[in-house]
Amino acid sequence: MTTKGILGKKVGMTQVFTESGELVPVTVVEVQPNVVLQVKTVENDGYEAIQLGVDDKREVLTNKPAQGHAAKAKTTPKRFIREIRNVELGDYTVGDEVKADIFAAGDAVDVTGITKGHGYQGNIHKDGQSRGPMAHGSRYHRRPGSMGAIINRVFKGKKLPGRMGNHQRTMQNLQIVRADVENNVLLIKGNVPGANKSFVTVKTSVKSK
């Protein structure tokens, strides 16, 4: 199955009515025209993919290699660059624009983004653990529980206080409610990872029903 994909920026959430009168919560994703910066082939790169870029970046903030890479596509340096695999390479050439019209209402997509960062958090906030008694002489409230007395080491993956969020996550099998080509907007049913104004990747779902 060939994949279609586009890069965008999360605007926020709202709700719209469908033709049947159902009120649906949607995430608004702004998808300005993406530029194909590179077409990767098995002969040159060992795998097939296209490299897309979106959101112009000032040249003074860009190093020389990135400027030259963008110049090959006759465009300006881009702030957000990602690769899309399993595409039909014959449909793309360097410098082409990819717009919102590659998707239509009803399409199933996977959306990848960076989740909100919450900083250093304890077990109760980070992992949903239960707190201890807050009264009657208890001196155990919000601390991690005992790890046992025998093992003499901490297992990998042990749930302990630490940095929460700011991970790459993918929401699978979301439905596109509307694809507005004139305004460069996709309305996606439900929520997608990341804060408002963060970049996301929208691709054809790998588990579409």
Curated annotation (Swiss-Prot):
> A single GO molecular function, which one?
rRNA binding
The record's Gene Ontology cellular component field reads: cytosolic large ribosomal subunit
Q: Name one Pfam family in it.
A: Ribosomal_L3
Question: What is the official name of this protein in its record?
Answer: Large ribosomal subunit protein uL3
Indicate yes or no for the key word Cell cycle: no
The keyword RNA-binding is annotated on this UniProt entry:
yes
Name the SUPFAM superfamilies on file.
Answer: Translation proteins
Q: Gene3D superfamilies given for it?
A: 3.30.160.810, Translation factors
Q: Give the record's family classification.
A: Belongs to the universal ribosomal protein uL3 family.
Source organism of the structure: Lactiplantibacillus plantarum (strain ATCC BAA-793 / NCIMB 8826 / WCFS1)
What biological function has been recorded for the protein in this entry?
One of the primary rRNA binding proteins, it binds directly near the 3'-end of the 23S rRNA, where it nucleates assembly of the 50S subunit.
Question: What GO terms in the biological process aspect are recorded for it?
Answer: translation
Matching InterPro entries = Ribosomal_uL3 (IPR000597), Ribosomal_uL3_bac/org-type (IPR019927), Transl_B-barrel_sf (IPR009000)
Q: How does it assemble?
A: Part of the 50S ribosomal subunit. Forms a cluster with proteins L14 and L19.
Q: Which UniProt keywords apply?
A: Ribonucleoprotein, Ribosomal protein, RNA-binding, rRNA-binding
